[in-house]
């Protein structure tokens, strides 16, 4: 008899298990019941990742927001003065430049067969086991092995058998290169008598340097000359994502991605990392750049994104097809999910362990505190970089700015940190849908922005939509922005107008092309809006989902994160004066600043523009005048008060980041790598720290496994007992260990309280060959947006 219990890739249960308690804590008592966060002040400071453990032990900071290096995290495990929270918060990929080379040259990654061969040239197991010392899991698609949607595609991953096989990969590369006209001369690929060179940009801040070196060696062994260019964040990002791929400043880059929240039913990631239409594939949808194009992926991706499916099964099939197409194209080679370790001082309490982001999620800094202290110091690798651009329209896209901004601004909805399902945050909602097959009548007085006339226009008769969502913004509109002005429907309407006008006003779309092109496929599904009263708005949209919360998330009109007068002034600078740009690509194309409201130069530029607007009594009256309304949503007098409050804010704080969250930005000093966030204690703010604490989830465990050897020709049963929250399920694959072929798959049969069985009939076991098989198991819960995997090896014999 032979039975061995092994990890599949790695043991995901261990991957997700924090050193904190495994059940949500119910004894959290914040130090204050005032509106706002638990502490009065947050300090963000930069600490080198190599020194971070020493600085934490020395009391220089209370938590480190950048993931520790693996060796450093291991050393801290036995330190009683430090808590380690672990989560699969970071993923690694290699993005390949598939642009065709100029005449007389050859880009190997323009050849799909070479890109596909890269899947087997990368030793993911070595990366996970050696470079990350067991603190990572090999990754083959956009889905981490912890993601709920990994269950949707894990048989595809198994069938692809993308295990490290360098000899096979080199053979595939050789066949493709020879077909393209290249020759292997003294072990080096040449094309028209010149060596084929690959420019490889490798990040240096973390283990990606070692990953890059591993891949560089594999490429050299495959016959390529590799120019390794080791770069930190800002110059690497600039070269890869802000230059035309056909200029070949790069051929391959070590990407790293942070995860903000779990998502039970993904639609964004599978699009963003596979389909060009969202602007995250080489070419980045920038006008004038060479573009990676794939109409089939785009069309299918838009259908998934917009809920154009009949049921969950149809949605899953779309997802599976996109996953397979992504593997076929292999523009991105996924490498690993990193079990990132975040260090927190032992006396800090109030941590929420988001399943995807760990303590770096939305919740923790709103509720964390130290006894007898009113402040926390948060360390990060950087507080500011040259790519940290703070504008609410086309910036705040890097981890360093977004980690801070997340504390300043509240979302309308946010995914639950455990279930991964969108939930109300500051906006409640009611969903009515006729989908997937029916339609609802849109009231004739519903309106949309008409960029041609520059007005809101009623949609008229005979307009239909699949779904209607009624949003209640009371928790926003009965509260104030940081500068003391009450948030209102006018702020929501300006945000709506801005999105539509950038996308459909040809003059604006010509300037901010990427924004326009990537937003239109979503905006065109909105069929009308209706303001019901000072707090509520109806949204009519052609979108359906089997979970109503996803309909509400899709249709959300705004999170009113920035006052309308700031957006109006920014629009004036970007589109009328042409003295700034929202996006980096537009800034480069028109040689103007990529506007950042925390930089003194840029903030003063906005201040001057607002002063001019105020002096001229400028006011976007058309935006605030709804069809048939007897009065504007706001007026020139109120606008003057808004302008004055914003200008006073600049005088007091030296920047123009004004939002609605539990902290406000009190001080930001880029040269000093420092930011101070002070608690927003305005009595209108709707939450206290106690309202937002979530704690730590219970995870799924395999409590018992009974899987003996298979006797050929006899009925077989293996049983598994699970432990975890909610309704549990278990799916299995039976895999031939020699060929990696799937022999059987399905849902395990419920056999009692959290007990499941996998059964094979006499005929099924009779058809098996002698040898070793693997049961690949994936356990899920309706209360968790993650799965736990196990692999059991089983011998098949005559007795």
Enumerate the language-model features and the residues they cover:
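Local pocket/hinge segments that shape ligand/substrate recognition
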Residues: 35-36, 68, 73-172, 190-194, ...
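Periplasmic binding protein-like
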Residues: 53-57, 61-73, 79-82, 221-280, ...
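Long, low-complexity, polar/charged, intrinsically disordered or flexibly structured peripheral segments
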Residues: 427-472, 579-656, 661
């Amino acid at each position: 008899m032979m039975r061995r219990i092994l990890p599949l890739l790695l043991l995901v249960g261990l991957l997700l298990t924090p050193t904190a308690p495994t059940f949500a804590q119910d004894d959290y008592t914040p130090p204050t019941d005032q509106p706002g966060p638990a502490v009065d002040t947050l300090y963000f400071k930069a600490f080198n990742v190599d020194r971070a453990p020493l600085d934490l032990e020395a009391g220089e900071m209370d938590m480190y927001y950048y993931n520790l290096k693996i060796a450093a995290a291991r050393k801290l495990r036995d330190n009683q003065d430090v808590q380690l929270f672990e989560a699969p918060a970071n993923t690694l990929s290699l993005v390949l430049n598939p642009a065709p080379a100029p005449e007389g040259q050859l880009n190997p990654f323009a050849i799909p067969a070479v890109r596909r061969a890269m899947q087997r040239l990368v030793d993911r197991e070595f990366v996970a086991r050696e470079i990350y010392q067991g603190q990572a899991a090999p990754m083959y698609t956009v889905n981490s092995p912890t993601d709920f949607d990994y269950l949707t595609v894990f048989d595809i991953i198994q069938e692809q058998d993308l295990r490290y096989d360098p000899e096979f990969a080199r053979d595939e590369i050789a066949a493709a290169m020879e077909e393209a006209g290249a020759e292997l001369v003294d072990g080096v690929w040449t094309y028209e008598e010149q060596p084929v060179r690959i420019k490889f940009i490798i990040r240096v801040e973390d283990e990606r340097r070692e990953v890059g070196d591993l891949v560089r060696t594999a490429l050299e062994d495959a016959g390529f000359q590799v120019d390794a260019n080791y770069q930190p964040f800002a110059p690497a990002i600039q070269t890869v994502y802000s230059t035309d791929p056909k200029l070949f400043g790069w051929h391959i880059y070590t990407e790293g991605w942070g995860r903000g929240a779990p998502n039970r039913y993904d639609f964004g990631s599978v699009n963003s990392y596979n389909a060009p239409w969202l602007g995250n594939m080489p070419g980045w949808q920038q006008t004038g750049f060479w573009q990676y194009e794939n109409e089939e992926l785009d069309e299918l991706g838009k259908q998934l994104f917009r809920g154009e499916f009949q049921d969950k099964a149809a949605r899953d099939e779309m997802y599976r097809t996109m996953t397979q197409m992504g593997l076929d194209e292999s523009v991105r080679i996924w490498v690993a999910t990193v079990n990132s370790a975040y260090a927190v001082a032992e006396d800090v309490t109030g941590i929420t362990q988001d399943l995807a982001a760990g303590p770096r999620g939305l919740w923790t800094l709103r509720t964390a505190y130290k006894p007898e202290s009113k402040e926390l110091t948060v360390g990060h690798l950087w507080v500011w970089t040259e790519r940290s651009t703070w504008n609410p329209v086309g910036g705040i896209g890097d981890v360093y700015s977004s980690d801070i901004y997340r504390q300043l601004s509240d979302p309308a909805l946010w995914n639950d940190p455990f279930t991964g399902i969108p939930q109300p945050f500051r906006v409640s909602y009611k969903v009515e849908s006729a989908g997937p097959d029916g339609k609802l009548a849109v009231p004739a007085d519903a309106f949309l922005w008409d960029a041609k006339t520059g007005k809101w226009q009623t949609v008229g008769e005979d307009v239909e939509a699949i779904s209607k969502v009624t949003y209640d913004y009371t928790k926003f509109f009965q509260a104030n922005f940081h500068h003391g002005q009450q948030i209102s429907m006018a702020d929501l309407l300006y945000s709506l107008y801005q999105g539509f006008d950038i996308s459909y006003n040809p003059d604006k779309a010509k300037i901010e092309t990427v924004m326009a092109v990537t937003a239109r496929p979503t905006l065109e599904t909105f069929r009308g809006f209706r303001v019901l009263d000072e707090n509520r708005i109806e949204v009519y949209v052609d979108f359906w989902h089997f979970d109503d919360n996803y309909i509400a998330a899709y249709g959300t009109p705004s999170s009113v994160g920035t006052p309308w007068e700031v957006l109006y002034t920014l629009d004036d600078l970007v589109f009328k004066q042409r003295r700034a740009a929202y996006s980096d690509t537009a800034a480069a194309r028109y040689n103007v600043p990529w506007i950042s409201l925390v930089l003194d130069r840029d903030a003063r530029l906005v201040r001057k523009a607002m002063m001019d607007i105020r002096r001229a009594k400028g006011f976007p009256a058309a935006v605030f005048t709804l069809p048939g309304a007897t009065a504007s949503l706001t007026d020139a007098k109120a606008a003057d008060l808004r302008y004055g409050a914003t200008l006073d804010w600049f005088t007091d704080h030296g920047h123009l980041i004004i939002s609605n969250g539990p902290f406000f930005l009190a001080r930001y000093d880029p040269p000093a790598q420092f930011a101070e966030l002070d608690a927003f204690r305005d009595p209108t703010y709707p939450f206290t720290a106690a309202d937002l604490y979530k704690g730590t989830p219970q995870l799924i465990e395999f409590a018992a496994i009974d899987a003996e050897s298979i006797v050929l020709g006899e009925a077989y049963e293996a049983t598994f007992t699970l432990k975890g929250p909610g309704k549990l399920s278990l799916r299995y694959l039976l895999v031939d260990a020699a060929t990696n072929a799937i022999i059987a798959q399905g849902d395990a049969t419920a056999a009692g309280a959290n007990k499941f069985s996998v059964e094979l009939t006499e005929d099924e076991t009779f058809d098996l060959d002698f040898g070793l098989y693997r049961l690949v198991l994936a356990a899920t819960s309706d209360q968790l947006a993650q799965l736990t995997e196990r692999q059991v090896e089983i011998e098949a014999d005559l007795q």
